[in-house]
Amino acid sequence: MKILLIAGGWSPERQVSLNGARAMVPALEARGHEVTFFDLLENFNGLLAAAEQHDFALINLHGAPGEDGLVQAMLDQVGCPYQGAGPAGSFLALNKCAAKQIFRRAGLPTADWDFVPAFPGKDWQPRLPYPLFVKSNTGGSSLRLGRARNRAELDDIMGQIFAAGEEVIMEPVLPGREVTCGILGEDPLPPILIEPVAGDFFNYESKYEQDGARELCPAPIGDELTARVQELTLAAHRALGLRGYSRADFILGPDDSLTLLEVNTLPGMTATSLVPREARTIGLDFGQLLERLMELGLADCKKKQM
């Protein structure tokens, strides 16, 4: 197929996107596909024209545009198939506050949260007790994520987020370990247990640097907990109306409780990424995983045209 590989963009996660796309090109070409690399930052105005000249668009964007559903909506306008969630599901998943409302309504276990769209007054106090995890409401890759133990630390982190033009969401710091689980089609993949080495939580360095974290796959958490993680992952995927694939992140508490953190609709595709690691556990190499995502995207496009 003639594949338009859409990457780059202008979000703070641009470099992560480019790194993943560089890994995808040889895997696709080895399977006989003709790949056109398309950097959204350099030629956003040419997206629709380029999409019309290709059989499939592989989206490897992080943040907005891309995870916000804009690119998907544009591709839908010209009938170009792509992998993963459509515009609405992408937008809902990217907005953590909106997604958490949907999770809560669906009966999924998610932590309490405060949403702060603009810098509050000096007399304001967070509703939740310290310490708090503070992050961008629409950011990803654990960028602009911090732990605040008091108002001074909270103001510092919020200031960085607001300076980037984004809103703040904060949650209590939950004891436990992080578990992540992908969906491929309607099938949950084997979960991964994440133990950060660089830092005490899964931040940007832990996520993308070699040896930044120990990622144990399949997660050594027993069959019962594994099944529960997979059940919740599929439930979150469906609650947001997603398609094709996604990845859900959880905190596994000391009492074996599970708390859903968020769902990623365009999971990372670098050499250290989580979903490719999970796919390898079930026998799919990187090229086979990409092929499966394209098969799912083509089938989804046909359904929309019926």
From Swiss-Prot:
Its cofactor is Mg(2+); Mn(2+). It catalyses: 2 D-alanine + ATP = D-alanyl-D-alanine + ADP + phosphate + H(+). The keyword Nucleotide-binding applies. One of its GO terms (cellular component) is cytoplasm. Mg(2+) 1 binds at D249, E262. GO terms for biological process: cell wall organization; peptidoglycan biosynthetic process; regulation of cell shape. Residues 100-295 form the ATP-grasp domain. Its main location: cytoplasm. Pathway: Cell wall biogenesis; peptidoglycan biosynthesis. It is an enzyme of class 6 (ligase). Its EC number is 6.3.2.4. ATP binds at residues 127-180. Keywords: ATP-binding, Cell shape, Cell wall biogenesis/degradation, Cytoplasm, Ligase, Magnesium, Manganese, Metal-binding, Nucleotide-binding, Peptidoglycan synthesis. Binds 2 magnesium or manganese ions per subunit. It is found in: Cytoplasm. Gene3D superfamilies: 3.40.50.20, ATP-grasp fold, A domain, ATP-grasp fold, B domain. Mg(2+) 2 binds at E262, N264. GO terms for molecular function: ATP binding; D-alanine-D-alanine ligase activity; metal ion binding. Belongs to the D-alanine--D-alanine ligase family. Cell wall formation. HAMAP family: Dala_Dala_lig (MF_00047). PANTHER family: D-ALANINE--D-ALANINE LIGASE, D-ALANINE--D-ALANINE LIGASE B. This is D-alanine--D-alanine ligase. It comes from Desulfovibrio desulfuricans (strain ATCC 27774 / DSM 6949 / MB). The gene is ddl.
